[in-house]
Amino acid sequence: MATTDEHRTIAPIVGPDDPRHFTDSGIEIKPLYADDDLPENLPQRLGEPGEYPYTRGVHRDMYRKQLWTMRQYAGYASAKESNERYHYLLEHGSTGLSMAFDLPTQLGLDSDDPRCLGEVGRTGVAIDSIDDMRVAFDGIPLDKVSTSMTINAPASVLLLLYELVGEEQGVPAEELRGTTQNDILKEYIARGNFIYPPEGAVRLTTDLFAYCKQRIPKWNTISISGYHFREKGCSAVQEVAFTLANGIAYVQAAIDAGLVVDEFAPRLAFFFNGHNNVFQEVAKFRAARRMWAEIMRERFGAKDERSWRLRFHTQTGGVTLTAQQPENNIVRVALQGFAAVCGGTQSLHTNGYDEALALPTERAAKIALRTQQIIGYESGAADTVDPFAGSYFVEALTEEIETSARELIAKVDELGGSVNAIDFMKNEIEESAFGYHERYRIDQDIVVGVNKFVEDDPEVPD
């Protein structure tokens, strides 16, 4: 169902000659912002860093004491080859690991299953047994490195294998640190890699909440993901709204299963996309943090301040990378990573510039990691907390994103929550994706090297 013009969440198609400027969420950008664009009660809306409503960040000092975790997503072919890449990243300064699995593993299939022909090791590492997990983490001390696993339907099985490898290393389960994505709802909405119907799959998700509370208390039990919605074509407002709506669904399901909110909510984490519009992205992260704090405190009655904090990982936008003039992607990734840092991310993956063409080479992976290090040590973005706070433009954007996202969440609530609203969210994202393509097609939106500054005889990288 399309939204009305008054409550638009995607940009209109107006043509390249229209003087108006819009974000992808349909927010019209004024030529100039001033103090009368600031929201009322701004000091209360902002709060202090590390304090409710966490608009300015979940920690008081943010990056002054410690930079975000530089967690590069990697995994391909065999466990041995993935292990080599993990060692390479750690040796070059990565401070955490992020494990990519192939599609058969994501669907709970063994590599020798006939249905897996042509897919084994293609999009990530194939893990068929504990032997593969042992090889993948050979020589990597699991008490020193935190690992994020991008796995959903069979998340509990892969976490158990990881736990057992840790046990073999002499690392007690209570000392393991990391995250399982474990977000099955976004699979129905955006990716399609699910095994069971939604209701049963959500139960498995919340079962892992209970298991980790008892066995692996430092583990983040879920990474509630908006990243994939944005990759599928949603706007920034839709990314915030549908991610938090799914978060609401998981919290409610866990409570309905008998869990106490303050016993599982502090280990919930989120996963967002870092897109091209720096100012909108900074505003998006700030709005999401403020909204989640209120949802947890007011809607669910959480008392523990840790339950109010939206902690999130960011990956730069894969969908923004171009096969044409791929070196341009280095600049795109740097801007997206900069926005994520200025927006207060807890960890970050920066994409390789060649990922529109193939799995990243070692050179591309190193440049991506160096990009984070330059942001952290040279740009000044880490020197002060929430550097865009008080900006007329960013504060106005933060407020507008929050207002529009709240309206979308209300619509999901009216439909009975995320499980019942799967088709609604899919349709909204598809309409937004169509708008993206139309705006590019008519040159309303510009992609350098694709529909402007095109080279007739492009150089193909090695």
Regions found by a protein language model. Name each.
Residues 82, 158-161, 284, 326, ...:
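Residues at alpha-helix caps and immediate loop-helix transition turns in enzyme cores, especially N-
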Residues 263-264, 302-316, 324-353, 360-385, ...:
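Flexible glycine/proline-rich, aromatic-decorated loop/lid segments
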Residues 255, 273, 287-301, 335-342, ...:
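Hydrophobic alpha-helix feature that most strongly marks membrane-spanning transmembrane helices
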Residues 128, 146, 151-154, 166-168, ...:
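Phosphate/diphosphate-binding loops
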Residues 10-40, 48-54, 103, 362, ...:
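Flexible, glycine-rich loop/tail regions that form catalytic "lids" or insertion modules at the edges
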Residues 2-275, 299, 306-313, 341, ...:
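Catalytic alpha/beta active-site cores
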Residues 236-246, 278-291, 324-329:
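Charged, flexible cofactor/metal-binding loops and thiol motifs
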Residues 118-122, 186-196, 229-234, 272-277, ...:
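Short beta-alpha connecting loops at secondary-structure transitions
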